[in-house]
Amino acid sequence: MSTNPRLRVGIVGASGFTGAELMRLIGGHPLMELVVATGDTQAGSKVRDLYPSLSSEYDDMVYSEYDASEFDGLDAVFLGLPHMASQPIVSELFKKVGCVLDLGSDFRLKDPNLYPLWYGAEHSVPELLDEFVYGLPEIFRSDLEGARGVAVPGCYPTSAALALSPFVQAGKIQTTGVIVDAASGVSGAGRAAKPNTTFAAVDENFNAYGLLTHRHTPEIEQVSGCQVLFTPHLAPMVRGILATCYARPLDSSFSTEDALELLEQFYSDEPFIVVDETSPSTKATLGANTVHLTARVDERTGWLLIISALDNLVKGASGGAIQCANIALGLEETTGLPTSGLMP
């Protein structure tokens, strides 16, 4: 929509962790310019006061209250809002901007009947569900080209779907009885203070949560094509997701070598996927838009094991959103996105 060489973008809900990560990545993006950042709870505050790490790029930027008129003519808007908060504003934004990318859950599930079951409320604009493409480029890239609406995947579904999808699409595993155990850093719980995410609660602790009820379960099933038993865990770290997926091969002769070769071939042209024999670590993906994968077949028990690691705030949220925006807006997919993690 813009004739400016740099695409003009905005963020609704920029004061949370995913919003701050969007700001960091856009600040280093050579073809995007952030022109408005809303954060109703921080309206009137300088970005640098809440996130000193963003001072060099946003020295004078102030969070504003949401006003739809501020987004007139923008090339894209990213929504970093809580569950159910994007639905009331999307129709209006579609009239104003080139592409709406929702980092929340409001448009990920295609069946509106799933929302009251998993999110406790009816979907208020079910007619718009089909306007949103599911934003996992490695699986749905062609659908993202020129998309007006993008439902950016959740962090757990990103890690699980990228691990399982190659085997499902190749017809190599049973699609029932799949197990996904995944651990996330505490940033996945958001910036708001909660008793179970304080330093004292998280440090030197490791626990499962959302037993049988986690909202990412139907999303993982929708994207991977598997029936899954999903158990998330909270790990004593800030960033990262490590997902361990278990499935039964359909062919008893399927081997570790076969599994690794399948992953390598499936993702051979993917700039953000690393397949290796080495067991992935979350630290290796810190700050990067990459996913590290490996696989093993246990001949003794007959189980296929697939492990994936990613940064929940980058590939699992804001980096994935930028990747989708690049595709939807006709830019090179990798523009502005880091592929190397921070070590040590």
Where would I find each of the regions flagged by the language model?
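Conserved active-site and cofactor/substrate-binding residues in soluble primary-metabolism enzymes
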Residues: 17, 131, 155-162, 211-218, ...
